[in-house]
């Protein structure tokens, strides 16, 4: 298995695993709280199941960014415009992957903390929950930079690269709505789900794309 195949399957499987585990099973088996304290209480009430879902869900979520990082890294080359952009994108996605490992992994401390550490756990959950906007901000920037690199390179279907750019721009624009108190939540959810769908579609195009030879490994 080469890096292109591995990254493509990560990009296709990661969003599906994350959606099924966190958006469906978590809501059904653990429950969504209105506050961080309620989230902690729900996890403490279902410690074993919560731990299992965090294990699987975190792997799916982090796999998305590792897949993007591998795709960008395989094209990293400081001697060309597209290679330089790919280098920047690889660093962005590697950083997001590291942050995602941190805040998804923090859930294990909350789950194992029990009721005696409920107050501290609520603070941890509040920080973890508020990390998502930062992740999506840099995810959008990474998509735009990587999409631009791939569009210039022309080794992958332009639909894939343009989708990265388009949805990246949409997420950037959504960050300008922070002052709108009654901004429809459904719009944000549609854009979020769109990011997941775009990732799956891009993974498919990447799998079918022309292989890249960089002297490091086959993309």
PLM region spans:
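Hydrophobic, aromatic-enriched alpha-helical segments typical of multi-pass transmembrane helices
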Residues: 1-219
């Amino acid at each position: 298995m080469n890096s292109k195949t591995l990254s493509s399957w990560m990009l296709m499987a990661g969003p599906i695993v994350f959606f099924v585990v966190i958006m469906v099973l978590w809501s059904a088996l653990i429950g969504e709280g209105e506050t961080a304290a309620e989230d902690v209480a729900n996890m403490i009430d279902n410690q074993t199941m919560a731990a299992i879902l965090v294990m699987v869900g975190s792997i799916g979520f982090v796999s998305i960014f590792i897949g993007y990082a591998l795709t960008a890294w395989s094209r990293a080359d400081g001697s060309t415009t597209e290679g330089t952009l790919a280098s920047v994108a690889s660093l962005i996605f590697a950083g997001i992957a590291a942050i995602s490992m941190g805040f998804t992994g923090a859930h294990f401390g909350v789950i194992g903390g029990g009721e005696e550490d409920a107050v501290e756990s609520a603070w941890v959950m509040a920080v973890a929950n508020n990390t998502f906007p930062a992740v999506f901000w840099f995810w959008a920037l990474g998509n735009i930079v990587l999409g631009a690199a791939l569009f210039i390179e022309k080794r992958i279907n332009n639909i894939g690269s343009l989708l990265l750019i388009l949805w990246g721009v949409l997420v950037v624009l959504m960050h300008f709505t922070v002052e709108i108190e009654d901004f429809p939540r459904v719009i944000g959810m549609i854009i979020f789900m769109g990011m997941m769908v775009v990732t799956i579609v891009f993974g498919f195009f990447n799998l079918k794309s022309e292989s890249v030879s960089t002297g490091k490994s086959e993309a």
